[in-house]
């Protein structure tokens, strides 16, 4: 494993730990998820450039599409929660509340 891949793996792990630790605010969770998607994208690009199989070339584009969809849904959810409740706490996302 090269130093670049090791650093990206560490960044992914830190983003995952941030997602698990800072679950109170939706905005911090979304930022950590975007960091994870960025690390996955960079790892996919480096892997596809190193190995050169033709099947790996569209995978970074697919990851970018999923990251854009995740960001759009996350921001829509953040706007809905903050306009409804006035805060971005994740505990407000419980739909079973009366």
From Swiss-Prot:
Subcellular locations according to the entry: Mitochondrion inner membrane
Full protein name: NADH-ubiquinone oxidoreductase chain 4L
EC class: translocase
Keyword annotations of the record: Electron transport, Membrane, Mitochondrion, Mitochondrion inner membrane, NAD, Respiratory chain, Translocase, Transmembrane, Transmembrane helix, Transport, Ubiquinone
Membrane association type: Multi-pass membrane protein
Record has Zinc as a keyword: no
Role played: Core subunit of the mitochondrial membrane respiratory chain NADH dehydrogenase (Complex I) which catalyzes electron transfer from NADH through the respiratory chain, using ubiquinone as an electron acceptor. Part of the enzyme membrane arm which is embedded in the lipid bilayer and involved in proton translocation.
Transmembrane intervals: 2-22, 26-46, 61-81
Chief localization: mitochondrion
Cystine pairs: none
Organism: Nyctomys sumichrasti (Sumichrast's vesper rat)
Keyword tRNA processing tagged: no
Catalytic activity: a ubiquinone + NADH + 5 H(+)(in) = a ubiquinol + NAD(+) + 4 H(+)(out)
Entry's Gene Ontology molecular function annotations: NADH dehydrogenase (ubiquinone) activity
GO biological process, one term: ATP synthesis coupled electron transport
Similarity annotation: Belongs to the complex I subunit 4L family.
């Amino acid at each position: 494993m090269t130093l670049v891949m090791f650093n990206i793996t560490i960044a992914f792990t830190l983003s995952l730990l941030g997602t698990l630790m800072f679950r109170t605010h939706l905005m911090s969770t979304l930022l950590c998820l975007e960091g994870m998607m960025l690390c996955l994208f960079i790892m996919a690009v480096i892997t596809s450039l190193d190995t050169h199989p033709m099947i790996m070339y569209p995978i970074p584009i697919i990851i970018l599409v999923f990251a854009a969809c995740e960001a759009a849904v996350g921001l829509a959810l953040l706007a809905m929660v903050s306009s409804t409740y006035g805060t971005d706490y994740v505990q407000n996302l419980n739909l079973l509340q009366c």
